[in-house]
Amino acid sequence: MMCGDVMTKDPACCVPTDSVARVAKVMKTQDVGSIPVCERQNSRKLVGIITDRDLALHVVAEGRDANSTNVQDVMTREPFTCHPDEDLQSALNAMQLYQVRRIPIVDRSGQLVGIIAQADMATRGAEREKTAETIEEISKPSTARAA
């Protein structure tokens, strides 16, 4: 099975200068835990990703104002990505290695085409046993990364 078979196509995205308040509202509306960050409006060139964890650790816990804090201040830059034609096992391995729950999917020119989340693999993936192992590994406690 390939990444393109289970990814969510054309996910909502934001730009580095968006406020984290706006992104949090998009997360709520879309019922997602992460938003890919694209270079600029009308561009799908991936430059980062922002997660609900980033919001909790680097905005709320640090007492920052969500309306004046930009995505670029708290996002993960150059996240690990996969391509639609890569085997799903690559995404599973990356999730386990990097302890991430979501992986942006980009074409060969770096344009965002989708995203894979743990839930996508659990509900659509063929390798449910490996997915369960990966979720267990990802869920182990880790230290907070510096912004």
Give names to the regions the model predicted.
Residues C13-V32, C38-E39, C82-Q99, V106:
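The conserved cystathionine-beta-synthase
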Residues D10, R22, V26-K28, I35, ...:
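A broad "ordered helical/assembly scaffold" signature
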Residues M27-Q30, I35-D54, M95, I103-A119:
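A glycine-centered beta-loop-beta connector
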Residues A12-C13, R40-K45, G63-A66:
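A broad, low-specificity signal for short, low-complexity segments enriched in glycine/proline
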Residues K9-C13, K45-L46, T81, Q111:
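Short, flexible active-site loop motifs that bind/organize anionic cofactors or intermediates
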Residues M1-D10, T51-T81, D87-Q96, A117-A147:
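Tandem CBS (Bateman) regulatory domains
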